[in-house]
Amino acid sequence: MKYNQYAYVETSPEKATEELLAINFLPENYSSLSFSELLAVLTGNVLAEATTRQAKDAKLAEFAVDDQTDLAAFLLDTPTAITASQFANVALQLLGYHPNYDYSLTDPLTCGEKHALPAFKDLTSKEELIFAFYRLLNTRSKNGQILLDVMAGKGYFTQFWGEGKFMLFNGKSLPVFDTSQVIREVVYVQSDLDTDGDGKGDLLPVTIFRPVESQDQLKVPALYTASPYFGGIIDNVKTNHNVDENLTDATTWTNPKYVAKPLVKSPAPSGQDVPATELATGQSSYGLNEYLLARGFASVFSGAIGNRHGDGIRITGSPEETISQKEVIEWLTGDRVAYTDRTRRFETKASWCSGNVGMTGRSYLGTLQIAIATTGVKGLKTVVSEAAISSWYDYYREHGLVIAPSECQGEDMDKLAEVCQSNLWDGGNFTAKKAYEAEQAELLAAQDRATGQYSDFWESRNYRHHADGIKCSWISVHGLNDWNVKPKNVYKIWQKVKQLPVESHLFLHQGPHYNMNNLVSIDFTDLMNLWFVHELLEVENGAYEQWPKVMIQDNLEADKWHAESDWANDLGQASLYSPTADGYLSTVENGTGQLTFTDLGGTEFKKAGISETDWEYQFISGEKKWAKASLRFESEEFLHPTTLVGRPKVQVRVAANKTVGQLSVALVDLGTRQRLTATPKIFARGNQPFGYRFEADSLQEFVPDKATKAKLITKAHMNLQNYQDMKQPSKLEAGQFVDLEFELQPTYYTLPAGAKLCLIIYSTDQGMTKRPLETEDYTVDLAGTALLLYRK
């Protein structure tokens, strides 16, 4: 598998020598050393676990230069050069590869090529040797980290602990901060909000992990993770809403309104600055933050309103939620008051903070980055938003229907608020409990699970309509197989952000609702190190030009990434397909006639007792038990690999035999073959240290799985009563044909030669839609039905 490397910054030999000297890797007297002496010293310096020169020299015999000679013996002959093969053998062993197991000592260059390592060459001078080691230190090891990070995990950089300054190498920050003495503290930011109605501004607990070096003169930037889960998660899955119910006439919709909560203006910060008096007992919950904490970036967490030990109530997705999370940044930049404890007597300042703030986090944590960025708050320099919601309607609804996130059937705004209302665990917080119960009733009514229609309530939770307020640089990360936060969320915010005068990048991986910072196929963590150094330390390191604007992981070969200028329909050519009465999906023949299927609702699914995931696979694979409740149309086999891009669109002329109805459409890749695993395989658990005796991550990647019959590419759902307007339901008569036109979730998917594309038209999606208790007939007029794709 290829260890692709995008974060290595091309560096001159002169600059490389300077950087090697700065980290004490290249000895000051290197010019007086012979080639063989320098080779011994540099190899020994990689072995950070050996703390004396004698110990380092003793370990040289453990390394082979070929299948006959160890390095110590090789050096006895005082060589003045080393061949590409010999150096490759030593380098591969330093990188963690095992000779005779991972590769052959007689052919190390093939191993390097296999894993996309930098090319090895003959080294005939000390200058070449020095630069070769510089490149080696910046090369990804078998554990996925660059060799310099492996050395850090063995204690190499403890020699710099206490110096109180950032050190850079190849444009990235080094782990020179003492992780054994991290300051862990809690402060209470006062909000302008009074969401619990007690007449006082809500206090928002904020947890800070920062380098001990920031106690003195060093000011450090902050990585802020707005995490509603940080205070704890209330498990309420057993109380999720019932979805086994019939559809409701959507014309009963009343357009529920958003109602703002009262404000209580907080006092301006005074000159008082008392050190924090509460120790943090919570743990960092985001690996990228831990990695960068060892490299000098403070890590800040807050769940804001409604979180454990704080005030207020959770109001999922609301402007109040955005305001409260934004207020933490205002404290970090000196514009808001915070206190040492809940008595509000002693102010404390983020005097350790440089005023430059970046944001990190996935899912809800990524969502709040989008929300805060739209406010244009001062000090927020960049966001790295992963698997984020850009409109809450697109999370819990779709085209006039109640639609669940994957594996979250019955969840909704009120239930998520309950999950995150961790201050309910504070037994004495009676104010929050009373306000919470009232808010739950309001959320239940306003979210309108009866009709699923767009409303003012949902409009207030659509961050995309405030995208013009974004002033910071932007990175979005999303899984193309994320059916929790569906890809529409990142696609639609990307269409806005890419037009703004800010630097922006997009990563699309093959995962579901997953992080990508520890994949074999891409050095994402190193890229983010480079990025945050540029944005928060304000060092010009070429980060903006270092990698393509859009990077997309291939669905056939996990170690292949596509460089694109954009992610949009424009990447491909439009192709129109028509379903025909004999079950074909044709580009040359128009469909005629009518076909009918009977939707069974959720009754058979409940009887089967299988999971929603198992149902979906059996359904898309065409198992008769489930496929009979659908219409399926298959293309001819593709003669050449074909990549689908952007958002497919369907037009369906359909009639139902009831006055309500829901239509689902799926695009499926058919053909029995190996496909990538749904989630990455862990190669070695806990093998990526973030620093010396600190936290760690695990190397993982998608790998070929057992053969399957089919794979879902994309899908979408629509309420038949929105045939005239996506935001306004209309009356529907039984038997009335209506023309539905809607887009599917966006994709970037390659169909290999020999695959077939299958269009499935159905109604009940057991994992996402409501599951009616009654059957319903749907008749599709093929003459008014078509599929528009964009193909590369």
Curated annotation (Swiss-Prot):
Which Pfam families does the annotation name? Answer: Peptidase_S15, PepX_C, PepX_N
SUPFAM superfamilies, alphabetized: alpha/beta-Hydrolases, Galactose-binding domain-like, X-Prolyl dipeptidyl aminopeptidase PepX, N-terminal domain
Task: Identify the catalytic residues.
Answer: S363 (charge relay system), D482 (charge relay system), H513 (charge relay system)
GO MF term set: aminopeptidase activity; dipeptidyl-peptidase activity; serine-type peptidase activity
Gene Ontology CC: cytoplasm
Q: What is its EC number?
A: 3.4.14.11
Q: Where in the cell is it found?
A: Cytoplasm
Q: Organism's domain of life?
A: Bacteria
Reaction catalyzed: Hydrolyzes Xaa-Pro-|- bonds to release unblocked, N-terminal dipeptides from substrates including Ala-Pro-|-p-nitroanilide and (sequentially) Tyr-Pro-|-Phe-Pro-|-Gly-Pro-|-Ile
User: Sorted alphabetically, which SMART domains does this protein's record hold?
Assistant: PepX_C, PepX_N
According to its UniProt entry, the protein's GO biological process terms are: proteolysis
- State the UniProt keywords alphabetically: Aminopeptidase, Cytoplasm, Hydrolase, Protease, Serine protease
What role does this protein play?
Answer: Removes N-terminal dipeptides sequentially from polypeptides having unsubstituted N-termini provided that the penultimate residue is proline.
In the record, the note on similarity to other proteins reads: Belongs to the peptidase S15 family.
How does it associate, per the subunit comment? Homodimer.
Full protein name: Xaa-Pro dipeptidyl-peptidase
